[in-house]
Amino acid sequence: MSHQEFKVVVSGAGAAGIGAARRLRDAGVATLLVEARPRLGGRAWTVPGPAGPMDIGCGWLHSADRNPWAPIAEAQGLTVDRTPPPWGRASSLVGLGARDGAEFGAALQNFRREVDAAAEAATDRAADSLLRPGDHWNHLIDAVSTWYSGVELDRVSVRDLARYDDSGVNWRVVEGYGTAIAKHAAGADVQLDCVVQRIDRRGRQLRLETTCGVITADAAIVTLPSNVLAETPELFLPALPDKTEAASGLPLGLANKLYLSLSGADEFEKESRAFGASDRTRTGVYHFRPFGRPMIEAFFGGDLAAELEKGGKEAFFDFAVAEFVSLFGGDFARRVKPLRAHGWRGDPFARGSYSCALPGRADCRAVLAAPVENRLFFAGEACSATDFSTAHGAYETGLAAADRAIAAVRASAPG
């Protein structure tokens, strides 16, 4: 087995890891960025499509007016599209009348006010306890939770949900969010197809045992998803039970996408959307003609996404077609064809989509983010106090971890 030595090793080449590696490189610190996959980006992944790039992972630059990926993408020569998202325009909603759309919007806003108020209480609780008993819109509000948090409201901490900081401005990268994030690794020393199996702290240096050999370092930054950390306690030697427990309180919810081609696309308004149903939680949300392209981006979350993932692309497609037929009639089935889907739960290096604190576990984010021995640092969206579940939240925790690592290795340098 080979042996390599660096000042800092960064484990995981998603938004957090790439951000950390770039910061360390710019500071002149010898750094290796290690990634288990054969590609960069982590849960940010853009793939080619017949009508244009498709973001299989994150696609929206949330809080875009303060999202660092917007200026990064533009500096790369990519195009940031500032068209407002379909969920921000009532006129973009297909299949739900103006009156019903307004009623649902009001119900959702009322629920969010209840969340903010309840978060001030001394005791945390599950968000489903704030739904108005018998309200017609409860199922759809719960469905929104599966897209927003990746889980139904009974598994969402009110306190954590209220802490999420969203400016309400949402943009996209025409060439793909995943493209921008992967490009930001340019110039970094990267080892792909390299799984970190153990991080041993028993010596003067850290010893990382990987599938591509042993790596020693003065410090390491771990950016692995919370589900991976929760399910592989053997990663750390000696064990870090506080980290394992914190990660288990921040499980990754599930949101999966299916892209479909659409014939006769001009019948739909650009950037419009439709709910598959308004009277049940197990439904998809469909984005028609993103960027004006002749396609549909279908989004499934929570328990529904987990069930469909077991059946692969065909199951996602069959479910979507059934909802389309109920909305637009039987002839619509002939107008769509599946292009690409990905199941994030079955992805061994993700095991889900984005983190959501369980009721009573909101403070786990700070525990997960805390350094160990001033040489083992943690980053990733689950470590963000207010921007969790986003690529910019992950990136900013990566920068913070890198700054701590830079200070640590400089403080330990002789002379």
PLM feature segments, named:
Residues 1-415:
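FAD-dinucleotide binding site
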